[in-house]
Amino acid sequence: MGNFTSSVDTGILTFFFEGELDTICCMEIGDKVLNQMKEHKEKVVFDLKGVDYISSSFIRLCGSAASLVTSSNISLVNMNKEIKKNLTKIGLAAVLNIK
């Protein structure tokens, strides 16, 4: 099961995710992530360095997050090749900054 920590540095809200971001995990963390984003609507980074798996619920969370800030102000970084490939296949790379 996954979890996250967050920090704000130089105006950028960064979420550091770990583990498997499955449906149950996303149901538990989704509101926490979105509530923090509502307070900080500038630049947001989802750091996926410690993530092994994402479910469609995490993709939905990304969509909800993008609706709170301008999509050009949200980035997904440090993901493994498989996750990056899947996000690109479904078109999320065209909407969010995926690095």
Model regions: which residues?
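Amphipathic alpha-helical interaction surfaces in cytosolic regulatory modules
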Residues: 23-95
